[in-house]
Amino acid sequence: MGCLEMPRSPVPDFLGEPRPASNDAETMQPRAPAAVPPDARNGARVKAQNAAPQGVYRPNDNFLTPNMRSPEYVQMSTAAAITLGIMSGYMHRTSCTRCLNLLLTYPEGCRANCAYCGLARHREAERNYADRNFIRVDWPAIPYDQVIDIVASGGDGGRFHRMCISMITHPRSDEDTRVVLKKWVERVKHVPVSILSNPTTMTRLDVQELKGLGADIFTVALDACNREVFDRTRGSGVQSPHSWDKYWEILHAAAEIFGPERFGAHLIVGMGETDHDVLTQVQAIRDLGGHSHMFAFFPERGSLMDHLPPVPRPQWRRIQLARYLIDYCDHHLERMRFDASGALIDFGLPQSEIDAVIGDGVAFRTSGCPGKEANDISACDRPYGDSPPRDIASYPFRLNSKDIRKVRRQVDEGMSGASGCRGS
């Protein structure tokens, strides 16, 4: 489906409803995962049917899901498939994405059970892995050699500035990531590669090997902004194998092995943490030499949190701005002020400087790994991955004057809603 098409979903539409200043921990409780019938576990249905893959597979309830495995097959985001010319579609106010996001794929799927994720293990009873939505869109499966052939021959028109290999929690994921990376580096030397890692199955040696094979940037999807939210949404609270300590162990290894500016971590805002929690992680990652890649929580259809509200837009805007100040303006958390609830009430900078950053608009664009040009701080556009086009959270394009006026108003609302001032 095209990026503008909204998936049919039981997810409630919270837009326009009165909203609290932030999503508190008591509100943001995921449902408990239900038991999966034995005949649906570990991709049993797909393996029993054993339908042979025939080229590109687009998720479709009217067809048997083929038995596809990495490294021969990979899945890619809808935006990447449109950019590559594999799918037709329309993206609101943009014609392409500049990052080719690839996802490893197996009939068994991801063995983790993250509460906010459309790929989670608990969905085995409902949907085969290759048919699950992820970050709000379908991910068609494509022979990896076909992907490489298109990009290596210039079939993408030079639009991709980066490729990202997204690992999942699966016994083959580490080895297959190395295979996918090695083949890409050998054939597509002009597009650098990022690794979105799975720390749960990794060691320091794995990180070192990926660096040696030519990975340019290494990232960790920390996602949760404190230990409690992590455990509740992707650890023992939802029968998932991930550990806060293990994720930070691999993040520290990446900082040492890849070095400054060549590693980062994903953070999701709005899952029950405070502003102070988020920005504490942002500062910690920056102190190590890396960058934070921010996502606004938006309920994913089929996840254990699809009944919960998205992050309030005013809170999201103040976090986006504060994160940008820390990551790219040499600002520091210690200069900001927070109220007793942990809400940001003062950026700790003169109002004129804050206004200038808002007016530039870059702080409110999608954040991720950089592009090939020196001033391109994020090639990862992820069009509408954390919001519908009618209420954009992360802008996948340069903001125009109307967009700037809107985000400025939302920042003002965010600071007044937190009972504070915008600047010093």
Residue ranges and their predicted role:
Residues 2-98, 279-424:
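Auxiliary Fe-S-binding modules of radical SAM enzymes
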Residues 73-75, 79-124, 155, 162-165:
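N-terminal pre-triad scaffold of radical SAM enzymes
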Residues 162-167, 262-267, 296:
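Short beta-strands and strand-loop turn motifs
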Residues 177-193, 242-260, 313-330:
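Alpha-helix-loop-beta-strand connector modules within alpha/beta enzyme cores
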Residues 196, 200, 236-237, 250-276, ...:
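Conserved strand-turn element in the central/C-terminal portion of the radical SAM core barrel
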Residues 203-210, 271-287:
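Catalytic cores of alpha/beta
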